[in-house]
Structures are given as structure tokens and as C-alpha cells.
Amino acid sequence: MQTGELLGSGRSADVFAIDDHWVLRRYRDGGDVTAGAAVMAYLAEHGYPVPRLRGPAGAGHRTEPRTDLVMQRLHGPSMLQALLQGTITAEEAGARLADLLHRLHSVPARVSVDPANRILHLDLHPDNVMITSGGPVVIDWCNTEEGPPGLDWGMSALILAQVAAGNTAMAAPVRAVLASLLTCLGPTMAMGNTDSGCLTEARTRRAADPSMSESETHLLDDAMDLITELTPARP
């Protein structure tokens, strides 16, 4: 497929303009978009804010390579850009992330028969939320799977905490986003307890992520401590 302007690049994929309405997301290393596309189509049916897909999402109906996904072009800044521009506060960003997690976990699992399992994003942070005129839209579903909601909260918290524990200019605002997110935890999410299975599993996954830099990996222990510090006490 012929592509236009490169709009953005992540750790594993690039996004190209097709026209004013559609973009092409293409994996660089042979990744397969089929599973993520099926989840996005399912979530859209349940009213969750994801980009529209062009054409059927099922693997048997696809005409593009399995590395390519054609989806709605979203107009507006990412939540991270809005935070840096001052159009939303850190407290608002954290609350919106929490709301998106709560809404996602209210949708029944697509495949699992375990009633405790839900669809998980596993990479929900401010740069994966687009602020459009119609509201926030969640992008980048390449890591999605099904499991306990606490794992999704743990991954989001840990991603934020790694930035907040660093010494970059982003540390202070992201710390405030993290604090806001943690105040909105559900009553069963004991994320401040580093012995809880979900947060420990999140740390294990982050440590094993080959896309993380050595400096990011070294921040994991400090990030875990910061989550403990910022999580409000539960009754």
C-alpha cells in the first residue's frame, strides 16, 4: 500500500498518513496486527473509544499484509502533548487514565470464560491516548491480552512511575499524573502492596521487555517504591 507522510513512530511500529481520514499503522519487524484489530473491533461494538478500522477486522477478510492496519486518522494532541502544552492538568490526566481503565474493564472478556478476566491494554499511558473533539481515544493495542484488571493498573502505574523516578524534566508532572491515577484505584486494587501478584507481575514483564533501555530497567525498583509511597491507604 502506498503511504504518505510519516506521522509518528513507536518502539515497534510506524504510522503513515493515507489521507485526511485514514492512517496506516505498520510494524517494522514483522509483527501481526490481527489480534489487536479483533480486540479493537470488539471494543468498538461495546462503545469503548478506539479508532475505527477500515474494512472487516477478521483475519479471513483482510486484504492488507498482517503487518499493516488501516484505521481512523485521529485529529488532536496526545494526552502527553496536552499535558506539556498545559491544556490539561496532571490531575485531570491521571483521572482520565483511570476512567479509561475502569471503562475498559467493564467490558466482558472477548475470549476468556473466567468471569474475573477482562480485556487488558497493558500499555495505557498518556502518549497512547489521543484527545479528540469527541473525547479521548485509546490507541496502540499491540500488547493486548485478557487477564485480571489489576495487571493493567499495575502496568500503567509502573510505566508512569519509571518516568517519575527519573531525573528528566518530565519527572515532576508525570509524578502528579501517577498520584492522580492511584487515587482513582478501585477498592480491590491494592497496588501499593509490592507483594500483590498484579504489581509483581507488572514488574516482571517490564524487566523482561527487550524494548526498554538499560537506564529504564534500572529505575524499576525506585518506581515500585514510588507506587507504594503514592498509593492512598485503603480502609
For each of these PLM feature ranges, what is it?
Residues 44-57:
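Conserved HxN/HPN-centered segment at the entrance to the catalytic loop
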Residues 129-131:
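Hydrophobic residue at the +6 position relative to the catalytic HRD Asp in the kinase catalytic loop
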Residues 55-97:
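Conserved structural core of kinase catalytic domains
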Residues 135-173:
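Active-site Asp-x-Gly
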Residues 44-47, 80-122, 127, 136:
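Conserved kinase catalytic-core helix
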Residues 76, 158-235:
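Helix-rich C-terminal or lid/interface subdomains of diverse kinases
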Residues 4-36:
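ATP-binding glycine-rich loop module of kinase domains
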